A protein has these predicted regions:
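Active-site helix-to-loop segments that bind/position phosphate- or nucleotide-bearing substrates
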Residues: 3-185
């Protein structure tokens, strides 16, 4: 790799890590809101759901709060609160219900149900693709601006995937709603 590019990357993240994190999380929350609104557009029966409306408001407030935050750690806390609320209504976005694909709670290590397994698997694919793309252009995928450095973790890839996680979520919702994935898959 190019050591000069790596030094520039580190300097940039030290100088602008907070702003980059603010922009990434604001975009993530905005994209989550768009995913929910798209589902509401396609499913009139969900439009008056108070919990869904509350989550839309929490995500909107989250956008404002990340720009008021004074540290990356504070933003991580805001993101955790918004994610918990977002996933509290995720099962409602899966409109073609099947017993095998009931979603209750986001679990990761390990995923405890088929929906969480799908989410984790496709997030991993997206993160690996992002890491490969970063390395292709000479960036160090292990040096990020939001995710803390940890041996073996592509922190920058994780940072950049945050903004597009809703694409993975929409893909999983579509797989389930169109019955592309079944219980035997």
């Amino acid at each position: 790799g190019n050591v000069f590019l790596r030094v520039q990357q580190i300097d940039k993240f030290r100088a602008e890590g907070l702003l980059l994190t603010q922009n990434t999380m604001a975009a993530k929350f905005s994209n989550c809101r768009q995913l929910i609104r798209r589902t509401l557009h396609d499913n009139a029966e969900l439009r008056e759901d108070e919990n869904i409306q509350k989550v839309l408001e929490v995500l909107k407030e989250g956008i404002d709060k990340v720009y008021e935050a004074e540290s990356i750690e504070e933003i991580v806390g805001i993101e955790g609160f918004c994610a918990k609320n977002y996933f509290s209504i995720f099962n409602k976005l899966i409109t073609n219900k099947k017993v095998d694909f009931e979603f209750q709670l986001r679990t990761k290590h390990p995923p405890l149900d088929p929906v969480n397994a799908l989410l984790s698997f496709i997030y991993t694919l997206a993160t690996n693709e992002m890491a490969a793309a970063l390395e292709t252009v000479g960036l160090d995928s292990y040096i990020g601006y939001c995710h803390t450095l940890r041996s073996g973790r592509s922190s920058l890839a994780c940072d950049l995937v945050e903004e597009i996680r809703c694409i993975v979520e929409r893909f999983v919702i579509t797989l389930l709603n169109l019955k592309i994935v079944g219980e035997k898959d």
